[in-house]
Design a protein with these regions (language model features):
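ABC family nucleotide-binding domain
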Residues: 2-160
Length: 160
């Protein structure tokens, strides 16, 4: 079953077209790489998926929920803020330049977002944080500070 379906995405900044008729289908659990030269629109395309950028045409469907679609008149219609919010809470994105809080441990860096964004309590977050850190192979580093980790380890913390 298709999990992410981005069809015929168009994106312009002023009169500059940066995405023209770009499509992507991903199945649940599938690992996909988007490659291309610098400035080719890879990050913009992903920002459109994460609703960090609006689209000027096309459609975006995630897990069966239509986030954006273009009608016959060329107008892009978006899902309600509530629908977008609920779906985006289940998504994550690691940016090319990611930042961890240097004064916080690995575990604290993992726990802060669910605490601040979702209002979760630490006893709810702790088992999830342990599972995520185990998944990226960093549970044993949970009490370390980012400066003590390699760049790759820091990126894995950001992914978790």
């Amino acid at each position: 079953m298709t999990f992410v379906n981005m069809e015929r995405i168009e994106k312009r900044f002023n009169n500059q077209t940066v995405l023209r008729d770009v499509s992507l289908k991903m199945n649940r659990g599938e690992i996909v790489s988007i490659i291309g030269p610098s400035g080719s629109g890879k990050s913009t395309f992903l920002r459109c998926l994460g609703q960090l950028e609006t689209i000027d045409g096309g459609s975006i469907t995630v897990d069966g929920t239509v986030l954006a679609s273009t009608d016959a008149n060329g107008t892009v219609n978006y899902a309600s803020q509530e629908t977008q919010h609920d779906l985006l809470l289940r998504m994550g994105m690691v940016f090319q330049s990611f930042n961890l809080f240097p004064h916080m441990t690995v575990l604290d860096n993992i726990m802060i977002a669910p605490r601040m964004v979702k209002g979760m309590k630490d006893d709810e977050i702790s088992p999830i944080a342990e599972q995520l850190l185990n998944k990226v192979g960093l549970w044993e580093k949970r009490n370390m500070y980012p400066s003590r980790l390699s760049g790759g380890q820091q990126q894995r913390v950001a992914i978790a």
